[in-house]
């Protein structure tokens, strides 16, 4: 059985949902103390880690694997259409679709995608791919990973 706790950290509250497999076991919504989050950014990762640890324990939510909703301000997202290509070609080309938005070198980002649809030609062969693509700084991911680790969780999903 896979156990995971989902976190949604907002401006004023933290929402937690604990799942065992596909079954929702427990939820909690706790108000954040003042000055924890501003403009979608956590002001002190250490203070947030301590809050999450105490909030989970107080709500009967175990310290286990974690999934985190990342604020829109921390991730670049795009809907893109590309010619049909292999996964290897896609991972090579994906960073170039964000070149006008990234503030750092492409090597400092994680890139991912989900296929929204495949457009086939008249013979039924893939012609184009419509993707939901995203990019996030590796340092941002590491900051969240370290925060959750300090709180007693293991980041598995962003």
Predicted regions and their residues:
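N-terminal phosphate-binding loop and adjacent alpha-helix
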Residues: 27-57
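N-terminal start-of-chain detector that recognizes signal peptides
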Residues: 2-3, 38-42, 104-105, 151-152
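Gly/Thr-rich phosphate-binding beta-strand-loop-beta motif of the actin/hexokinase/Hsp70
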Residues: 1-34, 62-71
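Stable alpha-helical structural segments in soluble proteins, enriched in small hydrophobic residues
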Residues: 51, 55-59, 101, 151
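Active-site neighborhood for divalent-cation/phosphate handling
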Residues: 70-158
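Solvent-exposed, well-ordered amphipathic alpha-helical segments
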Residues: 18-21, 55, 113, 154
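Short helix-loop boundary/capping segments at the starts of domains
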Residues: 22, 57-61, 104
């Amino acid at each position: 059985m896979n156990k995971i706790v989902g976190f949604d950290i907002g401006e004023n509250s933290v929402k937690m949902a604990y799942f065992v497999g596909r079954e929702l076991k427990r939820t909690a919504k706790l108000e954040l103390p003042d000055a924890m989050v501003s403009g979608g950014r956590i002001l002190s990762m250490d203070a947030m880690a301590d809050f999450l640890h105490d909030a989970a324990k107080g709500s009967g939510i175990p310290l286990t694997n974690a999934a985190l909703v990342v604020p829109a301000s921390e991730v670049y997202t795009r809907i893109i259409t590309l010619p049909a290509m292999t996964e290897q070609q896609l991972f090579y080309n994906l960073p170039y679709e964000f070149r006008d938005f990234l503030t750092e070198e492409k090597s400092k980002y994680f890139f991912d995608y989900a296929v929204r649809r495949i457009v086939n030609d008249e013979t039924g062969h893939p012609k184009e791919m419509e993707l939901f693509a995203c990019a996030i700084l590796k340092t941002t991911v590491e900051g969240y990973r370290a925060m959750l680790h300090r709180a007693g969780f293991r980041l598995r999903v962003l």
